[in-house]
Amino acid sequence: MIAGQPIFILKEGTKRESGKDAMKENIEAAIAISNSVRSSLGPRGMDKMLVDSLGDIVITNDGVTILKEMDVEHPAAKMMVEVSKTQDSFVGDGTTTAVIIAGGLLQQAQGLINQNVHPTVISEGYRMASEEAKRVIDEISTKIGADEKALLLKMAQTSLNSKSASVAKDKLAEISYEAVKSVAELRDGKYYVDFDNIQVVKKQGGAIDDTQLINGIIVDKEKVHPGMPDVVKDAKIALLDAPLEIKKPEFDTNLRIEDPSMIQKFLAQEENMLREMVDKIKSVGANVVITQKGIDDMAQHYLSRAGIYAVRRVKKSDMDKLAKATGASIVSTIDEISSSDLGTAERVEQVKVGEDYMTFVTGCKNPKAVSILVRGETEHVVDEMERSITDSLHVVASALEDGAYAAGGGATAAEIAFRLRSYAQKIGGRQQLAIEKFADAIEEIPRALAENAGLDPIDILLKLRAEHAKGNKTYGINVFTGEIEDMVKNGVIEPIRVGKQAIESATEAAIMILRIDDVIATKSSSSSSNPPKSGSSSESSED
């Protein structure tokens, strides 16, 4: 303020909050996001119905899907949405867990701030606790080999237990395991899984049990000509990034016809060029042609006469998967194709799925890509099935890549909380308070599991703490019986990556929000188009 006059540095209409008010608003917004998904955690969690502005409905209990579909405006709330997206990107599962932990950390931090503990001190304590928690997960984890199918299946089933797809969890877990094993690559003694090699195709109709794994690729296209064979055995597949049609010139052209016979010669030449293309494909031994481009009607006729199965306008991503599955090379020029460019498959056939026809390329001898055909009675069921299978695939892949697992059912969270309280006693200072609050926040996971199962969370937490104090580190909540049991014996296990990434993402988000003490929100562009009236006070300044 100069000579009693305030200095305005922000534009008119700009909203600003600072200090504890800004921090409180950010924390409350983040906690609101956490609470919105809390009731969807675990096998007894509830589903959410999300309706967009067009009236389209999504029914799911998948954390990241719920938050993606929500129209979130508050910046702190958007940061919580990013937590779930990060968890989904790196792990594929545990999105709800990550958001609940982040909300718990912020709720506990609010109490410390009210006791005049500085946010920087809280952040330091949280970071120390996060590192210790991840160390504890590594310490209590159990190694698993790629050949331990039973354990890998249990992990997939644990993931599916909390989904609508749990009714067919045994079959879907088997499909997830086989799909991941088919595309996993062993390099330097470690497995790597590229999810670009796993194609998930959903098709409404049929039952959930009709979902199947295809050792090859599903192309959502039918053959281009009815005269072509429906099935080709011992297929030799040509993949083309070139059209089987006469290329139109890039510039406008006019033909001057002086003699009617010239038209016939012109058409005959076009026909001859198309015949030569088909003859070239036939000469290298191909009996299946799949192209990203178009196929001329005349070329379709010649392909049909040659007994060649053809599909056109296939997506680039599907072409890449076909190349990996069949061993074919994608050829850009038909003149350059050779027999060495062809891929192989035991069978290529047109199959009716629901109301549509699709092309199945199956029986690839050493597939580097596989497909999962997801079926379900309604569109909503199929969509949720796709999300469930995707999570299950990521769980199996994470376990295979990391080679370790930990107990589920809140057991790992309870053990972390128990050990963090002991760890806090060794630290001292105000960071000790933050570490203890971190332990309380981690216990939000078993608390939420108990609440969603209709159990008394206080009784459950007391029993859980008592078991872990006895050294029963794998004891968690059986949400179906309400008892505290050994989760490993019950087959409720999860990859260590799920818990470690959830803690890391939640901690970073909580610290980022705690370090904000000033929120400046500019007015919307619509309001900025209306200039202030003459003589009105302005909060803007010239640069």
From Swiss-Prot:
GO molecular function terms noted in the UniProt entry: ATP binding; ATP hydrolysis activity; ATP-dependent protein folding chaperone; unfolded protein binding
PROSITE patterns documented for this protein: TCP1_1, TCP1_2, TCP1_3
Gene3D superfamilies with a match to the protein in the record: GroEL, GroEL-like equatorial domain, TCP-1-like chaperonin intermediate domain
Region (Disordered): 522-543
Post-translational modification: The N-terminus is blocked.
Residue ranges, compositional bias (Low complexity): 523-543
ATP-binding listed as a keyword: yes
Keywords, comma-separated and alphabetical: ATP-binding, Chaperone, Nucleotide-binding
Pfam families assigned to the protein according to its UniProt record, in alphabetical order: Cpn60_TCP1
Record flagged with keyword Nucleotide-binding: yes
Family membership: Belongs to the TCP-1 chaperonin family.
Function: Molecular chaperone; binds unfolded polypeptides in vitro, and has a weak ATPase activity.
NCBIfam families for the chain: thermosome_alpha, thermosome_arch, thermosome_beta
Subunit structure as annotated in this protein's UniProt entry: Forms a Heterooligomeric complex of two stacked eight-membered rings.
Name listed for the protein in its UniProt record: Thermosome subunit beta
Source organism (scientific name): Thermoplasma acidophilum (strain ATCC 25905 / DSM 1728 / JCM 9062 / NBRC 15155 / AMRC-C165)
Gene designation: thsB
